[in-house]
Regions:
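Surface-exposed loop/turn motifs in large extracellular/passenger domains
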Residues: 1-201
């Protein structure tokens, strides 16, 4: 059994290596056309889907203290695409043999609560999410104090959000450098959120 397991693991590693080669080739092709890899991603977090609810964190609670360097929060440190890794299960082909591929991403945080204090050394400290490049946060609450000792982008729900935050509540103390806000230090789309915060300058 051990020899079969070793063979299987070796085969899976070889497949992973080949996927990385293909990804590098596609990146090179994109660079030749002048297109950015980020242009190939579509955020579908705000769309209702009929399939299984993947890409979702729901009903999580934190009561412990969280300390870190960057992208620090009570529930999720970062909602972002890591371009160094291969996205899984979301490649959509157009046509029979197309290199015109698109990735769809979904990242949802729903009905989560943070009661623990959050301290980041640098940018992006939030009660629920530190850095939110994409996705949706809804029906979340934060009651823990949020601070950045040497950075900015501090918020009761998110340090910075380019996604959507809606129907969320905040009651806490906030402190840091630039860009401090009750819901988000920097926020793109904020809907029906409520705050009762004290901001230290």
């Amino acid at each position: 059994m051990s020899a079969a397991t070793d063979t299987l693991l070796d085969d899976l590693e070889a497949i992973g290596d080949q996927f990385r080669v293909i990804t590098d080739l596609l990146r090179d092709l994109l660079e030749q056309t002048g297109e950015e890899l980020s242009d190939r991603f579509e955020d579908i977090s705000d769309q209702e889907t009929s399939g299984p609810d993947t890409g979702c964190v729901a009903n999580s609670r934190n009561t412990g203290t969280v300390e870190g360097d960057i992208n620090v929060a009570g529930i999720v440190g970062s909602m972002a695409i890591e371009y160094d890794f291969d996205p899984e299960d979301d490649l959509i082909e157009e046509g029979d043999r197309s290199l015109d591929f698109r990735y769809q991403t979904k990242a949802v945080v729903r009905a989560c609560m943070n009661r623990g204090g959050v301290t980041g050394k640098r940018d992006y400290a939030g009660g629920v999410v530190g850095l939110m490049d994409l996705g949706r946060v809804s029906a979340c609450e934060n009651y823990g104090d949020i601070a950045s000792t040497d950075g900015g982008y501090v918020g009761g729900i998110a340090g910075a959000s380019w996604g959507t935050i809606r129907d969320s509540w905040v009651k806490c103390h906030l402190s840091g450098g630039d860009y401090i806000g009750g819901v988000a230090g920097l926020g793109a789309t904020l809907e029906n959120c409520h705050t009762l915060v004290e901001i230290e300058e």
